[in-house]
């Protein structure tokens, strides 16, 4: 049974493992921090808990039934944020992948009253629109899962989890990763923009960019 599970969804699991390794390589998470998931039909593939995120392999990726939350690979320890990922898929039919990590500048804004300015460059406005902050809830809890998934249900693809980290929703692992990386870049640019005079993209151009999505 376990051997057959290893072979199932092999390509999709490889994509999840690769995205997690890229997240670590880009400095967007710590060795065991963060989690990435991918919806494949009624199953969610998700990175496990307690593993080195820089060297995950296909066989490390866990499987969860989206409808019930059952761990289909009980030999693997699930991420504490599994329920958060699962509820996003339950509430967002268009969600295919979710990336959650703890990038430095996003974490800075998650602990601040300031907002990330996504209007400084066209790419961040195109990929993110606005970044929404989710009120604090203890990590790994049902309360956090409900809060985050409710905001995702409203259509937000870029979220800051107060005093915690960042989360993105995408149409693929690369799309979700791109959004999270772009959110961190936008956060960094927002900090740097305090040092020199900048101007964001005006409303007319923002609307034109939005029409391209």
Q: Which residues fall in each region the model found?
A:
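Glycine-rich flexible loops
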Residues: 2-213
């Amino acid at each position: 049974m376990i051997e057959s599970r290893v072979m199932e969804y092999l390509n999709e699991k490889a994509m999840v493992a690769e995205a997690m390794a890229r997240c670590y390589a880009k400095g967007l998470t710590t060795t065991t921090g963060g989690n990435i998931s991918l919806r494949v039909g009624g199953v969610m593939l998700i990175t496990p808990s307690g593993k080195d995120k820089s060297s995950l392999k296909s066989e490390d990726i866990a499987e969860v039934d989206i409808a019930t939350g059952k761990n289909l690979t009980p030999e693997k320890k699930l991420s504490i944020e599994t329920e958060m990922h699962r509820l996003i898929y339950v509430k967002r039919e268009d969600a295919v992948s979710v990336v959650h990590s703890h990038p430095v500048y996003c974490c800075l804004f998650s602990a601040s009253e300031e907002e990330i300015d996504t209007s400084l460059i066209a790419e961040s406005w195109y990929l993110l629109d606005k970044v929404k902050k989710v009120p604090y809830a203890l990590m790994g809890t049902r309360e956090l899962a409900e809060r985050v998934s409710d905001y995702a249900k409203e259509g937000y693809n870029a979220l800051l989890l107060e005093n915690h980290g960042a989360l993105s929703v995408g149409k693929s692992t690369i799309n979700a990763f791109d959004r999270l990386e772009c959110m961190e870049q936008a956060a960094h640019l927002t900090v740097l923009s305090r040092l020199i005079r900048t101007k964001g993209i005006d409303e007319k151009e923002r609307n034109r960019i939005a029409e391209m999505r």
